[in-house]
């Protein structure tokens, strides 16, 4: 019997103060490095995720980014994703979460929009980097992943709770998508 004891090395982009990468199945025992542009968050690597350092290329078994991609210009997201993919080893996985543009649009057009739509719009931010410059449909995410050389293995829309200042927590929707570098598409959820 062969036991794989190799420790995976994963990168969490924009981890802030609450890293989440170890919640990904199979990554529970991974060595997680964090990357953030804001040194005050105390990441392992201080860098702009739109310009990944060359020394990170082909290094990681996986990359996780929760609510990060929407902070880049819509016109640069394909370039940003390509940079992240360059940091993956062949067969490496990219997992991202982004706010659902479909959900935000429904809320904005409803008679009584949820206060949760504010943080997903282009308002309500806390620092110079916390600005949404893009929103995504699941269709657009699939296109971006495929263009970056990833085979989509999982894609789904989920509900989660978001805190809106002193107003409390409200339900919102986000898209989750996972792709693998250099393998054929496996399934659609």
Regions found by a protein language model. Give the residues of each.
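Class I SAM-dependent methyltransferase Rossmann-like catalytic core
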Residues: 1-5
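Conserved SAM-binding loop
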Residues: 8-106, 177-182
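S-adenosyl-L-methionine-dependent methyltransferase catalytic module, highlighting the catalytic core
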Residues: 74-85, 93-187
